[in-house]
A protein has these predicted regions:
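Thiamine diphosphate
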Residues: 1-158
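Internal alpha/beta core interface subdomains
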Residues: 151-171
Length: 171
């Protein structure tokens, strides 16, 4: 479902007369271990939709890359109106990326960009060394939290989340 959201954002942007691109980066690991595999599998669809997937060397570098996408319009020669971006990772990655989240969120998003952050929490510590509930880390970084409860809401809140990110400037 996550890889289907990117083309929908770009299609909505095109309908509004915008030429945007997408960027996805994060770090593999359970409970999101299959997301990057699905993104690689959908690479042709994503490429055709103007969405680049770049797996991160680690969570923090992935978050820093996301931050950079929101600065694209600060440089001459940019070919898009904005870049909408998705970071993904699990609880320890959220912890590791705190500085990039705080500074990226404080810097804001580009007018036609936007950032969503997807955290795969392991509340029962089934596949992680420590249990996680990332909402508190996001609150600490002053990042709004959306909590979809099913796939339909994941897609709908993803679309609305990018619109909210653009409007508010928040990640």
């Amino acid at each position: 479902a996550a890889h289907r959201r990117r083309p929908r954002v770009r299609n909505r942007d095109r309908g509004a007369g915008l030429n945007t691109a997408g960027f996805v980066s994060g770090y593999r690991g359970s409970p999101l271990g299959g997301l990057d595999r699905e993104l690689w599998r959908a690479s042709k669809v994503l490429d055709q939709a103007g969405v680049r997937f770049q797996a991160g060397l680690n969570e923090e570098l992935a978050a820093t890359s996301i931050w950079g996408t929101q600065q694209a319009n600060l440089f001459p020669g940019v070919q898009v109106d904005g870049v909408f971006s998705l970071w993904y990772g699990k609880g320890p990655g959220v912890d590791r990326s705190g500085d990039a989240f705080k500074h990226g969120n404080a810097a804001g998003t580009s007018l036609h960009g936007g950032v969503l952050v997807a955290a795969g929490d392991d509340h029962t510590c089934k596949s992680s060394t420590l249990p996680h509930q990332s909402e508190y880390s996001f609150i600490d970084a002053m990042m709004p939290v959306l909590n979809p409860s099913n796939v339909r809401e994941l897609i709908e809140l993803g679309l609305r989340g990018f619109a909210l990110s653009r409007y508010s400037g928040c990640w």
